[in-house]
Design a protein with these regions (language model features):
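Surface-exposed loops/turns
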Residues: 69, 79-80, 106
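Exposed beta-strand and adjacent loop surfaces of beta-rich binding modules
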Residues: 28, 43-45, 82-84
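Beta-strand-rich domain onsets/edges
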Residues: 14-28, 32-37, 95-98, 108-117
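A short, solvent-exposed beta-strand micro-motif common in secreted/extracellular proteins
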Residues: 79-92
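Short, ordered, surface-exposed loop/turn motifs in non-cytosolic proteins
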Residues: 37-55
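Short, acidic Ser/Thr/Gly-rich low-complexity loop/linker segments typical of extracellular
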Residues: 54-72
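Sec-dependent N-terminal signal peptides
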Residues: 4-13
């Protein structure tokens, strides 16, 4: 009787709690910056904003980076949320087109290409 009770109790405790699966990868966003003819842009500043108001005022960026020699920067450990992206290099930027990206997929390597002109 005691053995049956222990077995039932053990079975109930193992199956009554569902653990959240372990996330293997952090949510990230890789931004590739290109100019109007498709060439990658080295050294462009990239800022991510959570709201359109912050994007418009260029305040409270949640993350910032600079495009590398291949015109790429990877933001790591982001929330799975939509973002407004502002990219600038000298007198070129991406204002007026494609500033908002959709909600990032959680635990995935998200990618976007931004054109500046």
């Amino acid at each position: 009787m005691k053995l049956s009770f222990v077995i039932i109790l053990f079975a109930l405790t193992n199956f009554s709690f569902v653990e959240k699966p372990v996330q293997l990868f952090n949510t990230s966003l890789t931004v590739t910056v290109r100019d109007e003819v498709g060439n990658t842009v080295v050294g462009a500043s990239i800022k991510l904003f959570e709201t359109e108001e912050n994007y418009t005022k260029e305040t409270n960026a949640v993350a910032e980076g600079v495009a590398d020699a291949k015109g790429v920067f990877r933001f790591k450990k982001l929330k799975a949320a939509p973002y407004f992206v502002l990219v600038k290099k000298d007198d070129k930027d991406n204002s007026g087109g494609g500033e908002k990206i959709g909600k990032l997929e959680e635990g995935k390597f998200n990618k976007v290409t931004i054109v500046i002109q």
